[in-house]
Each structure stands twice: as structure tokens, then as C-alpha cells.
Swiss-Prot record:
This is Zinc finger protein 394. The modification Phosphoserine is found at residue 12. It comes from Homo sapiens. One of its GO terms (biological process) is regulation of transcription by RNA polymerase II. Residues 237-247 have a biased composition (Basic and acidic residues).
């Protein structure tokens, strides 16, 4: 019976796909899938269903689920089946947006999550990794939280169990419930009291005090509660069981009892709400940190490291949504040798926040997410995949393209609350708001000009003659960093600014603007003496010398007379 149940679970999990297993209870009956999968199930025929595709383009994850769940019976023929699969796969992998390497990473990540043991899958998917390296970091962090080592090739579940909620027990078919009872009686002699099981069938919330009282005649069940074991366990592994992290074999469902686990001092330690007094605030923190999953890891203190009865145990009990789960904090050693309790859940999240597994091979800068690394690498490669359809200008980031498009649309979403003036970019608004705060303005002692503190040091370089930005190629120095970037294009030959009319390219935007006046005929520079107009300021300056020479010639002639 054990092998048949395991084979049945493997077959159903393989059909549903790896990501669906994280959203549903792993041991729910097939008739309960309709509440967890994005499909439409007919009541009279549980085996037949039609995908409920939205009218608008679904997100990639929804398309991936539809791609994995499509059945040949749902389509009219082989041509439609092949066409539907191609469409769903394209919506999922988005080849028009993602590179080949990114698409390959998505496929590898999906397969990596598939081969993980089910207990690790629930934890890894809770953190929603975006790449294989991020999933590996989650597994490593969990491994360190469980046994304090990161180099071992095995994950030990000797002190770990996954709790089963009352609703999940209620949804189990009779065959699986019988299997639970048989496994429990075989391994530890524990039995479920008939009164307790009937209360579960009636969907009633059972106080912890009453559970212990009803289970007291059996003895072993009360011992299980005192040993901080969950009432029902999906893990099902004994204290000697070790599961290789590469093996994805599901473990049989059974009741678990541990006579070696240390219990509470008395039943009176549990209050009326089924929780240990003084631990309510800690329970709320732990419940929020595990918001994405009902699969809660229960760690038990090893026998050699257990505190005495007079010491504070640090046990937690949580009873919510018809679920009773025990959490015992694992002791750790500080640098000074003092023992303390620390939640492995919080420790794992702290490690994940500190780690930056994605490192740039060019400059060594590290990032938390792979997508941030991809965006950063465009600085080195010069890739600019986002192009403006109006003028053809390209950008390395979509946010920069959005800002640029406002120059064509005239949109100014940022408004000053003091004067009502609107701006296209947030940086322009911040610069403008500094004009309202006079206390942040300073006066230059050299020329008397008043400017903001952020521009004061830049302004003072004009008087001091400082040029802190130096080119490594020709050793030419500049006052501003932006001028150095523009100068670098002379050595690299980069010409990012192209004319949309003739295709000619330039290394500076100002040069492109001057060139475009040839096509538009614009002449913005006007001579105040004769009214003649010019395209460039240099042409106007050259023209003004003609008037200056005439004035000088007239002055010389008058002096002779």
C-alpha cells in the first residue's frame, strides 16, 4: 500500500508541474485540485476540464501553467494542439524580450525545482527564486539553519517535521487516513482518539487543553504533544532517516511520535487559547515570516543540548486556521560560548538578505538578483535594447526610455506642491524645490553668486581651476564627470546619436542637434544689428565681427577728419 500511494503521488505531481505543488497541499485528493489550479473543473466529471484563458495576455507564470497542463483531449486535432503549445510557450518564455541565456535559465530553474525533495521545494518556492543561483542560495541557507553546515552533501531531517492542518486531514480520502493510522501504530504505537477524529470531521477548532485531555487515555498521543511533535506529519521520517538532497522521492504520510523529545512541564503550561504564555508576540512574528506556506518546519533540541527544567525553553505554539503546530527553537553558540535560541526561519531570511550571489566579471560588483546583474552588464557591453520610436534614440534601461518619451509627449507628472510648477523628471523637481529652501543656499565668496549646496562645490572649481576627472588614454582632465564620459567616445569611436533623416551618427547629442538643423532649416541665432539668422552660434559670432569691423573703420575715419 505504501508503494502504490507513493507512485500515485509521483504521477499526480509530475502531471501538475513543479510550481503547482507549492500552491496546493501535496497530499490533497484529486477532487480538491479545482480550488488551487487556474483551471475550470466540471462537477460531474473530475477528470475533464477546460483551461480558462483570460481575454488579455496572461502573465508568464499563468502561461507556463497552461502550457504544462494542456491535454490533447481539449483541442480539436493535432494541428490545433501544436499551435496552442507554441503560443503558450511563447507567452511563457517571451523570446522577443528575453535572450537565449535567460530562456535557458528559466528552463534549468524549473527542472532544478522539480528534482528537489518535496520538503525543500516548499521552502524554496516560498522565496520565489528568479534564477538557479538564487534557488541554490536558498537551499544552502536552509541547510545551514538546520544543521549549521553548508558543505555537507546531505540534508538531515532527523529533527524536522512538516505539519498537516486540520483542513488537509479532512480532505484526505479514507485510504490515506487508514495509511496514516497504520504507519503511526507501526512506528510509535500512536493512535488518534475517536473523539478527536470526529471533532476534525465536524470542522471544529479544538483547544489544546481539550486535545490533551481526550488523548490522555492513549498515553502516546499526549507524549507526542509534550514532545512538541505535530499532530499529523507529512515528513514521516524517523530520527535515523537521512535523505539525499538530490533525491526527489516523496516520503510516506504517517503519524510521528518521539518518546525522546522533551515535553512541557505540565499541561497547565498551555493557556486556554492553546499557546504558551508570554510567546504571543513571537508567534505573530513567525507567522508573518511564513506567510506564503502552511508547511512549517519544526526543529527539536538535541538531547545533549537541552536546557534544564528551570531554564526558559523558548517553545512556541501557534493555533490558527484550524492548525496546531509546535516550534522549538534550535540552540546556537555565540562567540563567547553562551548558548542562545534563534529561529532558523529568521536566520535564513537574514542570510538571504545579506548574500549577493551575482557578481560582475568585469568590475567585481555584486548584486542580489540576476536581473540587476543583466542591467548592470549593459554598461560594459554598451547594449541599448530600448529604442524610441519617435526619434530612434536608444537606451540601456526601460526607465530611461520612459523619461525620454516625455520629451515627445510633453508629459510632466512631477508637481511642486509649493508653486504648482510641473516637471518631466523627479530629479528636476528636486532641483527646483531647493529654490524654495533658502537656508540651503550658499553664496560664493569669489563672485558673489548664490547656489545650492549641491552645486556650490562644482561652482567653486571654476575659480580654483580644479579638474579632478582625468582621461586614462590621453591624460586630459575635466571639471565634470559628464564631460569625461563625452570625451571617452573620441577614443572608443562610439557614436550613439544617429540622425533619423540621413542616418549619420555623432558622438555627442549637441552635434546631432546642430546637424538636424540642416534638414529642418531652423536658424535659432539672430543678429541684433541686421536681423540675419544662423544655424550655429559660431556662425553668428563670425558674422558679428563684420559689424564690429565696420564700427572700427568708421571710428578711424572720423578721427582723421
Amino acid at each position: 500500500m505504501n508503494s502504490s500511494l507513493t507512485a500515485q503521488r509521483r504521477g499526480s505531481d509530475a502531471e501538475l508541474g513543479p510550481w503547482v505543488m507549492a500552491a496546493r497541499s501535496k497530499d490533497a485528493a484529486p477532487s480538491q485540485r479545482d480550488g488551487l489550479l487556474p483551471v475550470k473543473v466540471e462537477e460531474d466529471s473530475p477528470g475533464s476540464w477546460e483551461p480558462n484563458y483570460p481575454a488579455a495576455s496572461p502573465d508568464p507564470e499563468t502561461s507556463r501553467l497552461h502550457f504544462r497542463q494542456l491535454r490533447y483531449q481539449e483541442v480539436a486535432g493535432p494541428e490545433e494542439a501544436l499551435s496552442r503549445l507554441r503560443e503558450l510557450c511563447r507567452r511563457w518564455l517571451r523570446p522577443e524580450l528575453l535572450s537565449k541565456e535567460q530562456i535557458l535559465e528559466l528552463l534549468v530553474l524549473e527542472q532544478f525545482l522539480t528534482i528537489l525533495p518535496e520538503e525543500l521545494q516548499a521552502w524554496v518556492r516560498e522565496h520565489c527564486p528568479e534564477s538557479g543561483e538564487e534557488a541554490v542560495a536558498v537551499v544552502r541557507a536552509l541547510q545551514r539553519a538546520l544543521d549549521g553546515t553548508s558543505s555537507q552533501g546531505m540534508v538531515t531531517f532527523e529533527d524536522t517535521a512538516v505539519s498537516l492542518t486540520w483542513e488537509e486531514w479532512e480532505r484526505l480520502d479514507p485510504a490515506r487516513r487508514d495509511f496514516c493510522r497504520e504507519s503511526a501504530q507501526k512506528d510509535s504505537g500512536s493512535t488518534v482518539p475517536p473523539s478527536l477524529e470526529s471533532r476534525v470531521e465536524n470542522k471544529e477548532l479544538i483547544p489544546m487543553q481539550q486535545i490533551l485531555e481526550e488523548a490522555e487515555p492513549q498515553g502516546q498521543l499526549q507524549e507526542a504533544f509534550q514532545g512538541k511533535r505535530p499532530l499529523f506529519s507529512k515528513c514521516g521520517s524517523t530520527h535515523e532517516d537521512r535523505v539525499e538532497k538530490q533525491s526527489g522521492d516523496p516520503l510516506p504520510l504517517k503519524l510521528e511520535n518521539s518518546p525522546e523529545a522533551e515535553g512541557l512541564n505540565s499541561i497547565s503550561d498551555v493557556n486556554k487559547n492553546g499557546s504558551i504564555e508570554g510567546e504571543d508576540s513571537k508567534n505573530n512574528e513567525l507567522q508573518n515570516s511564513a506567510r506564503c506556506s502552511n508547511l512549517v518546519l519544526c526543529q527539536h533540541i538535541p538531547k545533549a543540548e537541552r536546557p534544564t527544567d528551570s531554564e526558559e525553553h523558548g517553545n512556541k505554539c501557534k493555533q490558527s486556521f484550524h492548525m496546531v503546530t509546535w516550534h522549538v527553537l534550535k540552540p546556537h553558540k555565540s562567540d563567547s560560548g553562551d548558548s542562545f535560541h534563534h529561529s532558523s526561519l529568521f536566520e535564513t531570511q537574514r542570510q538571504l538578505h545579506e548574500e549577493r550571489p551575482y557578481k560582475c566579471g568585469n568590475c567585481g560588483k555584486s548584486f542580489k538578483q540576476r536581473s540587476d546583474l543583466f542591467r548592470h552588464q549593459r554598461i560594459h557591453t554598451g547594449e541599448k535594447p530600448y529604442g524610441c520610436q519617435e526619434c530612434g534614440k536608444s537606451f540601456s534601461q526601460s526607465a530611461a526610455l520612459t523619461k525620454h518619451q516625455r520629451t515627445h509627449t510633453g508629459e510632466k507628472p512631477y508637481t511642486c506642491l509649493k508653486c504648482g510648477e510641473r516637471f518631466r523628471q523627479n530629479s528636476h523637481l528636486n532641483r527646483h524645490q531647493s529654490t524654495h529652501s533658502r537656508d540651503k543656499h550658499f553664496k560664493c565668496e569669489e563672485c558673489g553668486e548664490t547656489c545650492h549646496i549641491s552645486n556650490l562645490f562644482r561652482h567653486q572649481r571654476l575659480h580654483k581651476g580644479e579638474r579632478p576627472y582625468k582621461c586614462e588614454e590621453c591624460e586630459k582632465s575635466f571639471k565634470q564627470r559628464s564631460d569625461l564620459f563625452k570625451h571617452h567616445r573620441i577614443h572608443t569611436g562610439e557614436k550613439p546619436y544617429g540622425c533619423s533623416v540621413c542616418g549619420k551618427r555623432f558622438n555627442q547629442s549637441a552635434t546631432l542637434i546642430k546637424h538636424q538643423r540642416i534638414h529642418t532649416g531652423e536658424k535659432p541665432y539672430k543678429c541684433l544689428e541686421c536681423g540675419e539668422r544662423f544655424r550655429q552660434s559660431t556662425h553668428l559670432i563670425r558674422h558679428q565681427r563684420i559689424h564690429q569691423n565696420k564700427v572700427l573703420s568708421a571710428g578711424r575715419g572720423g578721427s582723421r577728419l
